[in-house]
Amino acid sequence: MGLLSQKDIKPFVQQAFVHGKMEGNVFHASEVCLRMLEDSKNQDDPKLGRYLFIGDSISGNYDKALRTALMGKLNIYHPPTNCGPVRKGVENIVQWLGAYDQPGLDWDVISFNFGQWDSANTKARYQDDLEKVIAELKKTKAKLIFVTTTPIPGGYPPPGELGPENKATGRVQKTMERFINPWALEVMSRHPEIEICDQHALISNEKFYATWLKKAGFHKKGENNPNGDLHIGGLLGEPVGRQLARKVLDVLGREDEPLSPHGLVSNDLDPRRQRSATKDIDVDDFSDLLESDQRLRKYRR
C-alpha cells in the first residue's frame, strides 16, 4: 500500500485507525483509515490562550457556567465524549490532547477529574492510572488543575466498607470524601505543581447545596427523586463552574482579572421557579457566591 510520510497528514487534524498484524517486532499495516477532525485553529481567537477541561457528565453540568465565566478570555475545549473513569483517560488521553506540539494547538491550561465512574475502583488501580494520565498531561507543559470529585448526596445508600484489594464502596454516601478524593490527593501530593480546585469542599459547605446534599439520590436504579441525583444540573452547576473558572485565571497569573458576568436574570433566580433541590434558595447569598472571588477561592488546598 506504500508509506504515508508525516507531510501526508499535516496539519494534524485527522484521526488514524490502523489495521494490520505483528510480524516479530514489526507491525505491518494493511489499511489506514483517516477520519477528519475539527480544525480548532479555524474557530480559535488567536489572541486568546487555549484551555482543555477533562471530566465526566458532572463537567457537562457546569459546562455553561464555566464557559460563561471565561467568555472572551480563553478558547475553551472539552473532549467530545463523557471522559468517564480514569481507565478511559489512560486509553484516550493522547487523542484528547491532540497535536499540542503543532503551532496553534498547544494548551495553556488543562483541568481534569476522574472519580464518579471510579467509585468502585481499587486504590492501587485508580492511583496507577492517574499517574499514567498525569505523565501525558505534563508533556504538554500546560498549567494543570485537578478537580476534586463532587459528593454523592444523602439519598443514596449509606456508607460501606472497603472491599477486597482496597476496592471503594461504589455510589453510596461518602465514597468520595472517604476514598476517591483522598486517593487522588495522595497522588497530587507527589506533583506539587498541580493546582487543586476543590469542588467537593464548596458543595459540602455552601448552604445553597444543603437540600440537594441531604435529599438527592436513590437507593434503587429507576427510582424517581424530585431532588435529582448526583448530577448538579441547572443552578447547581453555577457555583462550581465559576469556582473552576476563577482557579483557571489564577493559575495563569490573572488573579486581578474579573470573571465575565454570570448572565443569570431574575426569573432564573425566582424561588417559585426552582426545582425541589433549589427551592429554598437565598437569592442574595447565592448571587454573592457567584460574584465573590473571595468565596470562590475559599476552598483552597
Q: Across the structure, where does each feature detected by a protein language model lie?
A:
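A cross-family glycoside hydrolase active-site/sugar-binding cleft signature
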Residues: N113, V147-T149, H200
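A short helix->loop->beta-strand "cap" motif at the edges of active sites that frequently abuts
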Residues: K139-L144
